[in-house]
A protein has these predicted regions:
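An acidic intrinsically disordered interaction segment
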Residues: 1-14, 134-143
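Nuclease catalytic cores
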Residues: 6-54, 122-123
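A non-catalytic, helix-rich entry segment at domain boundaries
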Residues: 44-124
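Alpha-helical interaction segments
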Residues: 2, 8-11, 56, 73, ...
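Mg2+/Mn2+-dependent nuclease catalytic core
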Residues: 118-170
Length: 170
């Protein structure tokens, strides 16, 4: 292993067996709807911050970011009914609802960004920690200053799970 990411460390601390199977044995993960939602939103925000215009001006559209991720996952598991979904069991977030969730999360992020002077996008904070034999690979989504709250370090999250402070403490 040439490096360790925060998410790998987090997986290991929660479930060492899951980390072992996924990272060392390269076991195939079950496909999900929430991974392409989060990835599409993250990529759309990055494109927005790098100056791409929003739709309908021929710019950022959720479909352009979301559907290629779905197609890639379908190469692994083409049966969408086997994919894990978020939301309530009676109304799971799949298909069009998943795309709409990506749109909603992106629009909320753009709204929140209006109050932030962005200094860095995808800042490379990789390095070494004492006692760890492999380097830590770390990219910070946003570094900037909120107009009323001061300096911010932001990690985009599209789900209900909020990041813990270990990311910033390292």
């Amino acid at each position: 292993m040439d490096h360790l990411s925060y998410s790998q460390f987090s997986t290991y601390t929660k479930c060492p067996r899951s980390w072992y199977l996924g990272k060392l044995r390269q076991a195939e993960e079950k496909q999900t709807w929430y991974i392409p939602i989060g990835s599409a939103v993250h990529d759309m925000i990055e494109a927005y911050l790098l100056g791409r215009p929003l739709e309908p001006a021929g710019g950022i559209s959720a479909e352009q970011f979301f559907y290629p991720l779905i197609e890639k996952q379908m190469l692994i598991e083409p049966d969408l009914t086997k994919w894990l979904a978020g939301g309530p069991e009676t109304a799971p977030v799949t298909h069009e609802k998943a795309l709409q969730r990506a749109v909603d999360c992106f629009e909320k992020a753009v709204e929140e960004l209006e109050a932030i002077d962005v200094w860095e996008v995808e800042y490379d904070a990789s390095g070494r920690l004492p006692g760890l034999s492999v380097p830590i690979k770390a990219f910070i989504d946003i570094i900037g200053e909120h107009k009323t709250k001061g300096p911010v370090i932001w990690d985009w999250k599209t789900g209900s799970t909020k990041p813990d402070n270990f990311q910033l403490q390292t």
